[in-house]
Amino acid sequence: MRTYVFEKPLIRGTMLKRKSQFTALVDIDGEELIAHIPTTNRIGDVENKNLPCLLSYHDDPKRKLKYDIEAVLLSDDENWVGINQILSNKLVEYFFNEHELDEIVSDFDRVQREVNLGISKLDFKVGDTYLEAKTPLTTINVKYGKNIKTLPPKPFSSTGRMVQHLRELAGSLKDHEKAVFLQVFQYRITEKKKRLRSTHYEEVSQTFKESAEAGVEFWEIQMDFRPEGVTLYSVTKSADLFKSTYRATQDQS
């Protein structure tokens, strides 16, 4: 297995509390400072307080905040959960180029990023295959540690881009043999959890169904995230991604 190695090992710290959508107060070796959160989504259903975290440091004079929170620890083991969605695409590109993802696409001469398709811009074109990668964070599929506090779950509503991308992937099959929707988990799944229905559940459900019928393939990859780097842990093709990851939870009433 190849490892995506960080330029410098990540720094251990503690996320004391989330201050805004993009910032958090962190403690690094007793010093409190503000760090950037590289995701616009919430991190599961956990309270973002006193969470062990891994941070990258960026000595760029143009940056106001020098630290990014790259991962958090929600379990009692060293199963770090990567939260940087920009890093996800770098990892996917790396593992394709290292031929660690040949199960998904094996016949290609280059990996292209940010490729226009229809009215959308998809994440990748691997050889002749269009591929969209998503890093779901609203549900974290790990067994929480004893000190993790949870919050009442909230339904996810930002599904418009995903629906559009699925439709573009399905449409690409008119001229291409293959199209892939890839879920990227920057951690090892240890406990599968149900998601609440999104606020646009019916539209999302129908789009997944139509895309699968058109021939779009659904895959997921898990990773082993460490302070030094990231290793691919598993590659799985899902015959019924929608039911397995977007099913409704039982009524809470």
Name each model feature, range by range.
Residues 1-16:
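Extended boundary segments
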Residues 20-26:
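Short aromatic-glycine-enriched beta-strand elements
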Residues 40-54:
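Short nucleic-acid-contacting surface segments enriched for D/E, G, S/T with interspersed K/R
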Residues 60-79:
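OB-fold/S1-family single-stranded nucleic acid-binding modules
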Residues 75, 79-86, 93, 97-98, ...:
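Active-site metal-binding core of divalent-cation-utilizing nuclease and nuclease-like domains
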Residues 140, 144-200, 222:
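Nucleic-acid nuclease catalytic cores
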Residues 186-253:
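Domain-level recognition of nuclease-like catalytic cores that cleave nucleotide substrates
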